[in-house]
Amino acid sequence: MENSSSRRKMLKQVAAASLAATAFPSINALASSNMEENTKLKGKINHSVCQWTYSYLPLEELCVLVKKLGLNAIDLIAPKDWPTLQKHGITCSMCYTAGKISLTEGWNRPDLHPQLIAEFTEAIPLVAQAGYKNLICFSGNRKGMDDTTGLKNCVAGLKQIMPLAEKHGVIIQMELFNSKIDHKDYMADKSAWAVELCKQLGSPNFKLLYDIYHMQINEGDVIRTIKENHQYFGHYHTAGVPGRHEIDESQELYYPAIMRAIVETGYKGYVAQEYIPTGKTDKEKVAALKKAISICDV
């Protein structure tokens, strides 16, 4: 699967009409066959899962599943679906307002600032009113722009929405992607560049979504980077390297050590699973998610 196109497709489509429920095996039955009722977790890591990676399930069924797995959050949910989460007592651990949001057309483009400022000015109060904290944003692609200019442009645009974010207690989080494989030409592809953006903005309400999978591909050195820059990281995503699949022994990252490093920083936010499951059956995919959570539950 082409990961970048899948993610872009999700961001464009999820805000449209909800996925119609079709004939799926009962998630209650699938979950019960793989775990005890309401899995007990250790509590040091706040676990979440990105909806788009389990989008074959209607959101209602995904909510039932995550509750049985002991989770209380799902990532990357648009406002139209927040009532469904709330009905199940689940929070949105990372919000986005679809609109014209784009991974490739972002804050490094001054010509897009008026549009982005308008969209985020509308979105920030919505997030706060729903009781949520995190709202995703993107740098955009370089398209020939050098990193210094891109940094300057991002600062100029983002600083215009930070007072509103601070007023409402909403944290704007820029996601880091690899530009080698999945998101070629994406600007925020290095943690050092993104940390400098945080420093120049100087707001506690701007942080980074540190995607462990993406940063392993682009720069490695994951644990040291987390330890030295954790104050700028407001959210984490996981996936196996290579392939962006399960985080088990089939890939190169040792997630228990990474999770322990995160816990040792005093981090209280969410870690969201964002791998693409390889299981052929729903039962296998449910078991894989349970295993991923167990691996990260240090």
Predicted features by range, described:
Residues 62-81:
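Catalytic domains of carbohydrate-active enzymes, especially glycoside hydrolases
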Residues 53-55, 78-80, 98-100, 141-143, ...:
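Active-site-proximal loop/turn and secondary-structure-junction residues that shape catalytic pockets
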Residues 83-96, 154, 170:
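Short acidic, glycine/proline-enriched helix-loop-strand junctions
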Residues 2-67, 131-133, 188-210, 214-298:
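Histidine-acidic metal/acid-base catalytic patches
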